[in-house]
Amino acid sequence: AQGLDVMEVMYDMLIQGDGKELFYQPLGGYQSYSLDAQKKLLEHPNVLFGLSDGGAHCGVIADAGMPTFIMTHWGRDRTRGDKLSLEFIVKSLTSSTAEAFGMYDRGYLKEGKIADINIIDFDAMRLHRPEAIFDLPAGGRRLVQKPEGYELTIKAGEIIFDNGVHTGALPGKLVRRSNEKREVALNS
């Protein structure tokens, strides 16, 4: 409508946010403008929730917000298609993942288990827009996406985050998988 080339419009949009604007383009899985195929994948018994490339692409991918996105979009906000139950989401983010990595001593709120606990305000949960920060060695860039709605994060009985602010407590330690052996059968 402005008589501008698409690239000109994109560049104009990028400079509006003091150089901090980003464009997002899904690389796949959204060709039909529906997330129904992703829901089917997420529900498959051999699929684990999680994303990581060990930080190799932290300047172009902000995937640390994945748990918050799963809870807010799939568990609360989705309007075009069925949601996932919150119980399924929590199990998938906790015990299912722990067991897949042989960590049978965690992932449950049970006596004798190691429990890291997030106290959340589910209705207040949301993700901020991704932003680039330059705090890596030699001024390297990484993308971060801050969440809201996490009231407390407790590790080993100590509060490590209070309303999104780190308390300075560092009770964590190196995690190794359990020596416990279990038979694993893939579901088809």
Which residues make up each language-model segment?
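His/Asp/Glu-enriched, well-ordered alpha-helical/loop segment
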Residues: A1-Q16, L22, Y33-R126
